[in-house]
Amino acid sequence: MLTNFETNKVFIAKGLSFVPYSSTAYSLVTSLYNRNVAWSELPYSESPFHIWARDYMPVQVNKDKFVRFNYNPDYLRNYPEYKPYTSMMLSYLGVKVINSDLVVDGGNIISCGDKVIMTDKIFLEIVALGI
C-alpha cells in the first residue's frame, strides 16, 4: 500500500469550501500549492456531510491499483441520505477499483511502507452487520 507521500494526487471534498470549513480548506490548498502537490476538488462532494473523503474513497495500493472498501459506518446506518455518491465520483474520475466487502472507513487505515495499521473498529463493524 502506498504511503500518503507516494499517492498520485490529493482530492479535496467541495464541501470543505463552505463555512465553517472554508479557512481550513484555504490553508490546505495553500499548503499543497506551495509544495507543488497535485490536487483537485472531488466531484459530487458538495454536501457538508461528505467532507471526509478519506473515509469513503478507495485506498491506493500502488500506482494504478485502488481498493474500495464497503463504506457503511455505524453512525450513518440510519441516515442513508448522508452517504456520499462514491460510485458517481469514481465513474467521473475514471478510477477503476477492486471492491472489498470489508466494512472499513479509509480514515481508519494508515500505511507504513509495507505494513498497514488499522483501528479495531473493523471488528465492531463486522459484528454490527452480523458477518
Language model features: what each stretch is:
Residues 1-131:
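The feature marks the mature, well-folded catalytic cores of soluble enzymes
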